[in-house]
Amino acid sequence: MRAARTKSMRIITLLAAIVACAHFIPFYILLTTSLKAKGDYSSKWIFPADISFHNFSEAWERASLGNSFINTMIITGFSALLLIIFGSLAAYPLARRETKLNKAVFALLISIMIIPPLTSMVPLYRMVVDAGMVNTHAIAIFINTAAYMPLTVFLYSGFIRSTIPKELVEAARIDGAGMLKIFFTIVFPLLKPITATICIISCVFIWNDYQFAIFFLQDQKVQTLTVAMAGFFGENANNLHLVAAAALMAMLPMVVLFLALQKYFIAGLSSGAVKG
């Protein structure tokens, strides 16, 4: 029995190592390519002896990444904030009050999650044009918030059902606390793990969004990183050093965010999966 368990653990460890290598290799190639000086065509597997950071500064200027970074941070930050606030507020009564109406609303949210966003793109674009909101941060924030709200409510609901004791809420209610006070002073602080999970997931999705950005943010002044990077890649397809440097800079904020919140991210996923 013990030998079989040890063998299983070795197989799992080996598979985990293979998956880790599969994810690390593209990043390593990207890093070595970005650090090579112009004209250095040595193998992508060899780390450069003479490291050059000139590619980063040149890519930053030529791709106008500064403006794109600001636009993307505004859209991602406000969208994630709205998702956390309104998603948690919507999930709490759905998780705690299992009425027929709440069950129907929850089922509707789940069904929305399986609908591809592109199916509604044409009518949505016409509505945005009629409202005169094309090329504005507000429409990008609104659309991204609406797109990822069902997933946010789903994750919050599962976490609340599995980890927030009903007795804790009942005790606060007996003491005379109102619904909103109970939520913001007792429930919401306990949602830190799943909030970190939602923050990472939503930020990564919105940061990397291309389909909404290419439709609604066509003006260069409001372009996000994905749109700016797509244009930059097309113009510099033969200059892999610049392309690699630009790609590294674009992905860096999300890597930092994940490293900062990874402890809560894992806790949020595991806790929310314990109970339906």
UniProtKB/Swiss-Prot annotation:
Subcellular location: Cell membrane
Membrane disposition: Multi-pass membrane protein
Listed transmembrane segments: 11-31, 74-94, 104-124, 139-159, 186-206, 240-260
Domain of life: Bacteria
Induction: Repressed by the transcriptional regulator MelR. Induced by melibiose and raffinose.
Gene3D superfamilies attached to this UniProt entry: MetI-like
Domain ABC transmembrane type-1, chain residue ranges per copy: 69-261
InterPro entries cross-referenced by the UniProt entry: MetI-like, MetI-like_sf
One GO process term, biological-process aspect: polysaccharide transport
Presence of the UniProt keyword Transport in the record: yes
Disruption phenotype: Deletion of the gene abolishes induction in the presence of melibiose and raffinose.
GO cellular component, one term: plasma membrane
Keyword Protease: no
Keywords: Cell membrane, Membrane, Polysaccharide transport, Sugar transport, Transmembrane, Transmembrane helix, Transport
Family: Belongs to the binding-protein-dependent transport system permease family.
Functional description taken from the UniProt entry: Part of the ABC transporter complex MelEDC-MsmX involved in melibiose, raffinose and stachyose import. Probably responsible for the translocation of the substrate across the membrane.
Record text on subunit structure and interactions: The complex is composed of two ATP-binding proteins (MsmX), two transmembrane proteins (MelC and MelD) and a solute-binding protein (MelE).
Designated name of the protein: Melibiose/raffinose/stachyose import permease protein MelC
Organism of this sequence: Bacillus subtilis (strain 168)
